[in-house]
A protein has these predicted regions:
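Conserved PLP-binding catalytic core of the aspartate aminotransferase-like
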Residues: 97-130
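Generic non-transmembrane alpha-helical segments
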Residues: 89-93, 125-134, 166-173
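A short linear hydrophobic-aromatic micro-motif
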Residues: 96-100, 134-140
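Active-site C-terminal subdomain of aminotransferase-like
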Residues: 6-87, 102, 173-175
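Internal gly/pro-rich beta-alpha loop/helix module
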Residues: 1-3
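PLP-dependent enzyme catalytic core of the Aspartate aminotransferase-like
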Residues: 132, 141-175
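Active-site lining segments that contact anionic ligands and/or coordinate catalytic metals
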Residues: 87, 106-110, 144-146
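Short beta-strand-to-loop capping motifs
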Residues: 20, 113-117, 151-153
Length: 175
């Protein structure tokens, strides 16, 4: 069974994609409420209740776009290129930017890093100047701090190049 939240990369928030073998759905506990049984949706061809038609329409448009971009293979290659560019920029900064996540555990979608040893004032300035340069949403989660850059499918390589150029210039003028 594959259960995937679709938000940000496949469609709007709230859409979930489920791919399940029929035999797994049939083995599920029959005492579950009807709405919670995958066999119900298989039997009714996903139309047991009113589906979120606009959200499904958007997922369809995104799937067409993904296909036009070379399918999953093309998107994966592009996302790997974007992530490598950003991680390489962090790695080449002589410690000015530091990723707290080990190489083998790093995400290609959400890159977290600290600036100037985690100096909150410098990180706040980084976020402010990045936003002024059109690079919005770089501050990390309020409970963790640091910076967080999301490289979702729709983010272009050119946008990541603009970010890494900004990062090098920010380091040059402040580091």
């Amino acid at each position: 069974m594959i259960f995937a939240g679709a938000q940000k990369n496949l469609g709007p928030s709230g859409v979930t994609v489920v791919i399940i073998r029929k035999d797994l759905a049939e083995r599920a506990d029959k005492n579950l409420p009807t709405m919670l049984q995958y066999r119900t949706y298989i039997k009714e061809k996903s139309l047991y209740n009113t589906p979120p038609t606009f959200a499904i329409y958007i997922v369809g448009l995104v799937m067409e776009w993904i296909e036009a971009e070379g399918g999953i293979t093309g998107i994966e290659k592009r996302n790997a290129t974007k992530a490598k560019l950003l991680y390489d920029t962090i790695g080449a900064s002589s410690g000015y930017y530091r990723c707290p996540v080990g190489d083998s555990s790093r995400s290609k979608m959400n890159v977290v890093f600290r600036v100037a040893g985690g100096d909150e004032g410098v990180e706040k300035q980084f976020g402010k100047e990045a936003a002024a340069a059109g690079l919005v949403g770089t501050p990390g989660h309020r409970s963790v701090g640091g910076m967080r850059v999301s490289l979702y499918n729709a983010v272009t390589l050119e946008a990541v190049e603009a970010l890494t150029s900004f990062m090098r210039e920010f380091q040059r003028t402040r580091g």
